[in-house]
Amino acid sequence: LADHRDISQFETTGDDDFSFAIVGVSRFRVSTYKQRGSYSAVIRIITFTLPQPSELMIPDAVMELANTNKGMVLVTGPAGGGKSTTLACLIDKINTEQEAHIITLEDPLEYLHTHKKSIVSQREICTDTENYLTALRASLRQSPDVILLGEMRDYETINTAMTAAETGHLIFST
């Protein structure tokens, strides 16, 4: 399934995340892991088309956060609770309504955005760049207006994201 990924990461760490598509069917997000000496996976369906915020019952007040021009917006909740889809809806709103350079940093890429009014650069961790911190630091040299950071789990990434937000960028993350 993940022919574009290096299996050595999975063999070394016992975990990996990736996405793949079956043309005409759907995209899928996969989390693989070892347990009890065997291989396991959790697979989630990601539709090719992004649902409308109203279909997902995302409040208008949340969608208005897309009109912010700097700072940090965190979307929190349990696994499978719609964080990534909510963030994708916010990115799509910016892409549809504003001229901006949007950079998404995700592991794996979930929703694929096409350019509308904005230019959307999508980088997948472990495929296009080494890790979140490296990608975030590099993105700050790529003239972004908006950065979607798929997750923040370590001090350096959080600190760099906060500095980016304080210096005039709009950061979305979980």
PLM features: residue spans?
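Conserved lysine of the Walker
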Residues: 83
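Conserved P-loop NTPase nucleotide-binding/switch module
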Residues: 108, 140-174
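Glycine- and other small-residue-rich loops at beta-strand/loop junctions that grip anionic moieties
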Residues: 76, 125-128, 150-151, 173-174
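Walker A/P-loop
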Residues: 79-80, 168
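N-terminal "pre-motor" subdomain/linker immediately upstream of P-loop NTPase catalytic cores
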Residues: 1-78, 86
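P-loop NTPase switch/communication element
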Residues: 63, 67, 73, 86-143
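Aromatic/hydrophobic pocket-lining residues that form π-stacking "cages" and hydrophobic walls in ligand
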Residues: 30, 90, 135, 160-161
